[in-house]
C-alpha cells in the first residue's frame, strides 16, 4: 500500500476507562492514593534493605531492583493517567506515546527476567545451601541484574521502533488506558499480521523463557523440600520462597493471559482491566507481599520501628 498521500498523526487520544465525569474523579482519587502507596511502599523496602545489614544478601539485592522496577513502571503510566482523568482533551503527543510504550514495555520485561533470576537465587538457597554464598557472589548478582535490565530494554526498543514505523494514518484513538503495545498496533492502516507474530515471538522469548526457568527452579525446590524429614524444616524452606512465588503468580499469570495469543485476546474492556491490575495494583502489592510473608523483612521493620521509637522518646524527654 502506498503511503505518500496519507496524513500522519502527531498525537493520539486515549479513551481510558470512562467518559463519565463523576467516575473519572473517583478513579483519580483511587489511583492517586494507589500511586502514593506504591511509591512509599517500594522506597521503604529499598531504604530498609540499605539500613539493615542482615538484608545485605543476594535475595534482597534483587528485591531492591524489583522495587525500583515497580516504582518506575507505575510512574511510566499512572501520572499520565491521572492527568487525563481530569482533562477535557485526553491527548498524548506521538513522541510521549512512544516513550511511554518503550518504558512500560521495557520495565515489564525487566521484571519478568528479574523474577526468573530471583527464582534461581531461591533454588540455590534451598537446593545447595552450603555453597550458596560461593555461587551467588557479588559479581554474579551484578551481572544477572544487568542482564535483566539490558534484555528488557533491548526488547522494548525493538518493539517500539517496529510499532511506530507503522503508518497510523488518521486513526488516532487508542481504546486503552495507556499506549499499550497491542492497542497501538491496532491503529495501523496496513496489515499487521507480521507485527502480531513478532509480538508473540518476543513474548515467548522474554516471557515464556523466564517462566520456564521459574518452573524448573520450583520443581527442583519442591522436590528438595519434600525430601526434608522434619516438618519444621519443610516449613522454613517453603517460607523462604513463599513471597517470591506469590509475586510470580501475579505477574506472569496476567502477562501470559494478555500477550501470548494476541489474535485470540480478551475483549477491550478485559484488556483494560488486566492492564490496570498489572500496572496499578501489582507494583503496590509486591512490597506488601514481601513485608507480610517474609520473617526477615518483618524483623527488620520491627527493629527499625524500635529504633525510631527510642529516638522519639529521647527527643521527647
Curated annotation (Swiss-Prot):
Residues 50-57, 121-139, 220-236, 293-317 are cytoplasmic. The chain crosses the membrane at residues 26-49, 58-79, 101-120, 140-158, 197-219, 237-260, 273-292. It is a multi-pass membrane protein. Glycans are attached at residue 5. One of its GO terms (biological process) is detection of chemical stimulus involved in sensory perception of smell. The keyword Membrane applies. It is found in: Cell membrane. The keyword Secreted does not apply. This is Olfactory receptor-like protein OLF3. It comes from Canis lupus familiaris.
